Amino acid sequence: MSDYTVGEDCFTELPAALAEYGATKVAIIGGKRALAAALPGIEAALEDTDVEVLETRVYGTNSTRANIAKVVNSPACQEADVLIACGGGKALDTVKTAAIELKKIVFTVPTICSNCSAATAIAVVYNDDGSLEGYSYPNRPARIFINPKIIAEAPAEYFWAGVGDALSKQPEVEYATSAGNLEHTAGLGLALAHTCSEPLFTYGVQGLEYVRLDLSTEAVKQIALDIVVNTGYVSNLTNQNDY
């Protein structure tokens, strides 16, 4: 499972996280708006360290083979020890998929929380016309940095979409595993799926109200954790051929 750090000061732990992997060179890839939101905090955290940012790259607008190839073919991404992916699902999935070929460690910075891509070992790949091509199966991100302030200041519709996505996780997993005879890992996933719904009912309405006001609060943090971490862990535990 991915390690994660949550809080408005989450990027202060970035140097130590990179040091755990012996990483001194990084490439930062994301959407244009995502980089505008996350880059100041990342750069401030890396200032006066021995970590070198080789490149900051706008990935494109969709997780297509063409955009994935641009990351794969980037000399900076090839040289980097860690790829730091910033954005929503499409940006994160682009970097996660590119990392398969590059054999790189990925850190994720979800700047919206419309889904659990920041934590999962699966990625969606689209055709150039926006239709679904299929899926890739990267390693799960090594570390997630969740900044509730960035998420609260993103458009509220993404937060609302994430609530819906997380709300579907428990019944989805219950149905997929209803035949029983679960392996231990899938059983863990089913148990964890039962933790996904309660935070949404407890904090969802309040969290959405605060996001509409661009305010970072405990409710926003709890919903972001549920959408990204709880459901992401469930996905990784139950993403098996039989389910």
Residue ranges: model-predicted function:
Residues 75-98, 102-113:
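A short, small-residue-rich loop immediately preceding and capping a beta-strand
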Residues 60, 86-88, 239-243:
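Active-site nucleophile and cofactor-binding loops and adjacent substrate-binding regions
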Residues 11-12, 35-39, 65, 90-97, ...:
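Short glycine/serine/threonine-rich phosphate/pyrophosphate-binding segments
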Residues 1-81:
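ATP/NTP phosphate-donor binding region
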Residues 184-243:
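Active-site segments that bind and position negatively charged phosphate/pyrophosphate groups
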Residues 102-196:
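A glycine/threonine-rich phosphate-anchoring loop and its flanking beta-alpha core
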Residues 8, 31-32, 86-88, 109-112, ...:
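Fold-independent oxyanion-binding glycine-rich loops
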Residues 15, 43, 69-72, 164-175, ...:
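Predominant activation on well-ordered alpha-helical scaffold segments within soluble catalytic domains
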